[in-house]
Amino acid sequence: MPIGVPKVAYRLPGESTPQWVDLYNRLYRERVLFLGSGLDDELANQLNGIMLYLSAEDASRSLFLYINSPGGSVTAGLSVFDIMNYVQASVTTIGIGFAASMASFILAGGERGSRIALPHCRVMIHQPQGGMEGQASEVVLEKEEIVRLRRLIGRLYVDLTGQPLSTIANDLDRDKYLSAREAREYGLVDLVATTETATV
């Protein structure tokens, strides 16, 4: 039985009396964001809007993006990646549970030195996928777009991980699963968190 989003007390800056706000709004005020489901345009737009707002409010304070997601839309993921790199506030990414497909790409796209995986996080990378249907000319165009996106994602993974393109291309050919430690060795994250390294 779902319990809904709990309410928590929060005192807005300049207010003397706390208000009851939902948990996620409280966490947003602390600059904590979640990618906790499949990524589509709606969720990407919500994350992007929150990052833009919080960065404009105070670019000197980091944002913390917790990721537990099977991935999702390539274009939605690229929009989150671009906004993370566009905003002036640094974005720390933290993998929790499972970061797969575009979610692993977003995890790797955090601020260098601030890409973290919790000890039991699993990470999976693979090539962009898409279903093709329609007239033959449309299928050809869609296939060309998938190939273009695959090359783009491959080049970006090279930049993010330091792995050679040949390794990335080979590893993207099929689902590649990594433990938190293996993700660090691969260059997808910089740190495997422990209780001593936890920040938020």
From Swiss-Prot:
It is an enzyme of class 3 (hydrolase). InterPro entries: ClpP, ClpP/crotonase-like_dom_sf, ClpP/TepA, ClpP_His_AS, ClpP_Ser_AS. It is found in: Plastid, Chloroplast stroma. Disulfide bonds: none annotated. PROSITE patterns: CLP_PROTEASE_HIS, CLP_PROTEASE_SER. The keyword Protease applies. GO terms for biological process: protein quality control for misfolded or incompletely synthesized proteins. The keyword Chloroplast applies. Its EC number is 3.4.21.92. It catalyses: Hydrolysis of proteins to small peptides in the presence of ATP and magnesium. alpha-casein is the usual test substrate. In the absence of ATP, only oligopeptides shorter than five residues are hydrolyzed (such as succinyl-Leu-Tyr-|-NHMec, and Leu-Tyr-Leu-|-Tyr-Trp, in which cleavage of the -Tyr-|-Leu- and -Tyr-|-Trp bonds also occurs). GO terms for molecular function: ATP-dependent peptidase activity; ATPase binding; serine-type endopeptidase activity. Pfam families: CLP_protease. Belongs to the peptidase S14 family. PANTHER family: ATP-DEPENDENT CLP PROTEASE PROTEOLYTIC SUBUNIT, CHLOROPLASTIC ATP-DEPENDENT CLP PROTEASE PROTEOLYTIC SUBUNIT 1. Cleaves peptides in various proteins in a process that requires ATP hydrolysis. Has a chymotrypsin-like activity. Plays a major role in the degradation of misfolded proteins. This is ATP-dependent Clp protease proteolytic subunit. It comes from Ostreococcus tauri.
